[in-house]
Amino acid sequence: MKCDVKTLDGKDAGSIELSDSVFGLPVRTDLLHRMVRWQLARRQAGTHKTKGISEISGTTAKPFKQKGTGHARQGSKRSPQFRGGATIFGPVVRSHAHDLNKKVRKLGLKTALSAKAQAGQLIVLDQAISESGKTKDLLAQLKVLGLEKVLFIDGPEVNEKFALAARNIIGLDVLPQQGANVYDILRRDTLVLTKEAVKHLEERLQ
């Protein structure tokens, strides 16, 4: 698959051949769904907690005798039917993470890249370097390219001045190639890869 290469100023910088085994796969929404669920489950803090009956402060004495009162029998003031009582089978602190095979994760990333390529939402840049490191200069370049909600993926090292210029722009994310992931690719309208990123991603995902 051939793709045009642009510069940050919107000029043509030749073309690049993208591997069909990474950028030309059929789009499988089931895989993308599984990957997003897996990523978000790993991020979830899981700090929810309610007190069980053994954790509630209060007396352990029986509220009143078993028989002769005319009331339903009760064994503890800490039971859930009483005000201030325990929660039964409530949430506990736990990890929400679940397993997903490495092959599925690899295929999911390739599918996300392919989905962007097939939707015409993939741009390849010659390089992502900012000379000034100023946000206003980068905003002007993004306007020329017609980009708003965008994810930039560079090679192993992101240009320091580019990252500095980009960090205060809402809707713009910058990642090194090793940080490429399905969730961040899908949540932005456009995916921008540098030639260096394409090279490393193809090597890693072949």
UniProtKB/Swiss-Prot annotation:
User: What are the GO MF terms of this UniProt record?
Assistant: rRNA binding; structural constituent of ribosome
* InterPro entries xref list: Ribosomal_uL4 (IPR002136), Ribosomal_uL4-like (IPR013005), Ribosomal_uL4_dom_sf (IPR023574)
Q: Where is the composition biased (Basic residues)?
A: 64-76
* Pfam annotation, one family: Ribosomal_L4
Q: Which Gene3D superfamilies does UniProt cross-reference here?
A: 3.40.1370.10
Where are the residues of the annotated region Disordered?
60-84
- State a GO cellular component annotated for this protein: ribosome
Q: Name one GO biological process term.
A: translation
Q: Which domain of life is it from?
A: Bacteria
Query: Which keywords does UniProt give here?
Result: Ribonucleoprotein, Ribosomal protein, RNA-binding, rRNA-binding
Q: What is the role of the protein in this entry?
A: One of the primary rRNA binding proteins, this protein initially binds near the 5'-end of the 23S rRNA. It is important during the early stages of 50S assembly. It makes multiple contacts with different domains of the 23S rRNA in the assembled 50S subunit and ribosome. Forms part of the polypeptide exit tunnel.
Instruction: Describe its assembly.
Output: Part of the 50S ribosomal subunit.
Listed PANTHER family = 50S RIBOSOMAL PROTEIN L4 (PTHR10746), LARGE RIBOSOMAL SUBUNIT PROTEIN UL4M (PTHR10746:SF6)
Q: Which family does it belong to?
A: Belongs to the universal ribosomal protein uL4 family.
Listed name of the protein: Large ribosomal subunit protein uL4
Species per Swiss-Prot/TrEMBL record: Rhodospirillum rubrum (strain ATCC 11170 / ATH 1.1.1 / DSM 467 / LMG 4362 / NCIMB 8255 / S1)
Gene designation: rplD
